[in-house]
């Protein structure tokens, strides 16, 4: 007969136990009993022949694709002109006095942030915008282009103008304009590994030299020596400044590069012009080899035509207009859905390209992207605005992956020790937190996004269109793109974007100027930045509390009036540093702080209500006696694991589920195991703050017996049969807690100290978790442990009781006070003393 739920609870000692704990508890360590219970609860039978269940409530397998939902009415969020002040360290010093070593180090990390991956894989421009919504290809293309354009205008992206230059908007930083003695300085990092062809690296070019530079001397390029007249011979054409570059000694025929420049052509100093010249010549040949549409030296879209050098058409006609969009103006409509109808709607479609306010030299940047982008809802609660998802996952994959730096995440107990108090709380919302942190321009070539232009994008995704023989953009196949769907989409989009349709239909390549969200380095940098700022705020207001995790910043003060004054002072300080706060999203929590999914009050910590509801829903939908896919089990364990510390048996109760996930086998819930878990999660107990105190209770064990020292009283006992030492130590800790009721126990066993009971026999782990809940352990060396003698059967010998003070830890959770000096032989996991214990003692 299967094990009933009531019997199982009694066995785990969760109800009033029958016999004394010293007899009952060691039985739970018995292997035979654990095996029988596992069989009764159907926990051990992992190989099942019935088909697996792949969906439980909202949980589907971890790798199943949820169908994304496109919203044609998405609004692009606005980005304020975010500019973090470069003298942030000096401003912090003015605010609080000299900074600590840790604060200094963290602020220097992000001024500017650097990113040097081992290997960067460049992808064709066609992969710039991911075809994530097959039904809404054109709408998604324009919405994404508009989002990228908005980011560029806000100074978050660089726009690649040529192989070695880029333009951007917003205020420049000093590392973007390193000028010495009037000429640009070469500052390529050795680690970057980019052998520069140009004797200058990042530095802003004078605005007048935005037009391509011309040079008449003979220079060597990758294509071999060029005759002087074959170089970029510039000529004014009706004042438009467009240039025709022709590379004669090329075995692949003639290349026509026709950008429409934005200003008159200027001659530059020979060193800089040769660099631009080489990049243009290289670029022309490079793009001819690899792609039918590339970028010229000034970053405009170029069309490449493959004509024999003596072609009559080539000589007789003027340059073909290079803009795909404007070519429709001169062509006959092919049908009622021809794009020429849209192009002829207005005379002035505006420029083919826009330039930023500042121009900067960059390391060599190919006309490629390194990651794709697409749009999703801003968050589950806000579906009116979109969010850009950038996929730079190439840096986290394969043998050349970058191992991202680790950083401290506060665990539940540390968070409770720190924040559980009778303070009033409010939380601040930093708008676009990631986009505050500037990146060094040398990182730009590794973080490229963009698009190949509307014509290629549509052509690539429509089956009837062909890009043959580099003929894309000539009249024969110009109309291949025309279709009813495209026509209707563009007509609707014209209402939204107007003449920007033309600008967005051109190819573009953009590199990140601020840290992007899709790179593993970004969370680390953001955590360092906000924790350093909070550390400064805490030292400026020692009677208050400021704490942050990523972009979530909370402030606490003893009264509401005090909190409002603190809020005003801190807000002004953050604004003076250039940090943008969203005042509409400031939340005042009263005495119960909602933070990181928890509710934290003076009574301790509990999970937030929406998580409790999710758990209830999960148990309602959980099928019994049906094998559930282990990927779905991962989702279930993720949810239950978050709330496990608030239950009686904690993580050990979930061990059967962990075992099935590890074995990649389906898991079948028996009615008893499901009832046990759902009862566990029905009553959640708060995790309380640990209190400092003096340890008066000690325990010790050997494989055959245990001993306790409770004040001046000594006790000992023996086990029926010898047990593994860790199991014996855990049992001794349980006996000490149940005999003395003390919440502070001295032990020398590291496994007991860690309070992780998942590696013990399953039943014992569950019972011990409940008995030792809320107990703190203090390390006592074996030689000084008063319980050492009783555990070995010697009751007559008395060692003096130690005065062992206990101070609860707040871990390394971004509290960077000066740590005491440590001997060099200690491991490098140093305990950072909290400044709170110096300046302000929690009530």
Swiss-Prot record:
Compositionally biased tracts (Low complexity): 223-235
Region (Spacer): 178-346
Renumbered residue ranges of the record's region Polymerase/reverse transcriptase domain (RT): 347-690
EC numbers for this chain: 2.7.7.7, 2.7.7.49, 3.1.26.4
Domain of life: Viruses
Binding residues annotated for Mg(2+), in chain numbering: 429, 551-552
Family matches, as Pfam families: DNA_pol_viral_C, DNA_pol_viral_N, RVT_1
Stretches assigned to the Reverse transcriptase domain: 357-600
Region (Terminal protein domain (TP)): 1-177
Note: Hepadnaviral virions contain probably just one P protein molecule per particle.
Domain notes: Terminal protein domain (TP) is hepadnavirus-specific. Spacer domain is highly variable and separates the TP and RT domains. Polymerase/reverse-transcriptase domain (RT) and ribonuclease H domain (RH) are similar to retrovirus reverse transcriptase/RNase H. The polymerase/reverse transcriptase (RT) and ribonuclease H (RH) domains are structured in five subdomains: finger, palm, thumb, connection and RNase H. Within the palm subdomain, the 'primer grip' region is thought to be involved in the positioning of the primer terminus for accommodating the incoming nucleotide. The RH domain stabilizes the association of RT with primer-template.
Role according to the record: Multifunctional enzyme that converts the viral RNA genome into dsDNA in viral cytoplasmic capsids. This enzyme displays a DNA polymerase activity that can copy either DNA or RNA templates, and a ribonuclease H (RNase H) activity that cleaves the RNA strand of RNA-DNA heteroduplexes in a partially processive 3'- to 5'-endonucleasic mode. Neo-synthesized pregenomic RNA (pgRNA) are encapsidated together with the P protein, and reverse-transcribed inside the nucleocapsid.
Name of the protein in its database record: Protein P
Annotated organism of origin: Hepatitis B virus genotype B2 subtype adw (isolate China/patient4/1996) (HBV-B)
Lineage of source species: Viruses, Riboviria, Pararnavirae, Artverviricota, Revtraviricetes
